């Protein structure tokens, strides 16, 4: 998952996708690595029941040479990652989630409100993506080809 600086949207998306099911390896990066995950982001995610990671943000170069089933970009600026990762990605998926800190907000309550609104939008859209693109691939399969519990045995 790629965003501008791996400090807000990408981390939120990682936790949200991981909450939908097992079997996924979800990594995050920014076009440029930011300094640290913002406290308000951690607070909102923890309020929604996530054990939020405060690991240091990293940049796209960390993952550029690896093979990926999906590279998910979360803002138009992050789409430039395709130039760096061509040939090692099976599918690119783009979202356009607004940066809650764009324009420089200094009032703490307003920051939290914007991050909470972003969380709600991301959760809805990422669930739809998971349901339509990933869920079927991650479900256990029986030897008969059924992807849910069957009565073969």
Model feature map: region roles:
Residues 1-62:
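Conserved active-site segments centered on acidic
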Residues 81-142:
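Phosphate-binding/catalytic loops
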Residues 5-7, 76-79:
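Short glycine-rich anion-binding loops that position phosphate/pyrophosphate groups of nucleotides
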Residues 68-69:
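Local beta-strand N-terminus motif with an aromatic residue
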Residues 140-153:
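Cysteine-cluster motifs in flexible loop/terminal segments that predominantly coordinate metals
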Residues 11-13, 38, 79-84, 104:
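Short glycine-/acidic-enriched loop or helix-start segments at secondary-structure transitions
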């Amino acid at each position: 998952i790629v965003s501008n600086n791996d400090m807000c949207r990408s981390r939120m998306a990682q936790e949200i996708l991981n909450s939908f099911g097992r079997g996924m390896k979800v990594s995050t990066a920014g076009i440029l690595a930011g300094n640290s995950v913002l406290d308000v982001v951690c607070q909102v995610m923890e309020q929604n029941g996530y054990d939020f990671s405060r690991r240091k943000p990293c940049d796209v170069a960390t993952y550029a040479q690896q093979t990926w089933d999906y590279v998910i970009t979360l803002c138009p600026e992050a789409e430039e990652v395709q130039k760096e990762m061509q040939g090692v990605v099976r599918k690119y998926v783009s979202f356009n989630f607004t940066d809650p800190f764009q324009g420089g907000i200094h009032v703490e309550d307003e920051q939290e409100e914007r991050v909470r609104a972003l969380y709600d939008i991301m959760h809805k859209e990422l669930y739809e993506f998971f349901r339509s693109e990933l869920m079927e691939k991650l479900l256990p399969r029986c030897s008969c080809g059924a992807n849910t519990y069957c009565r073969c045995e």
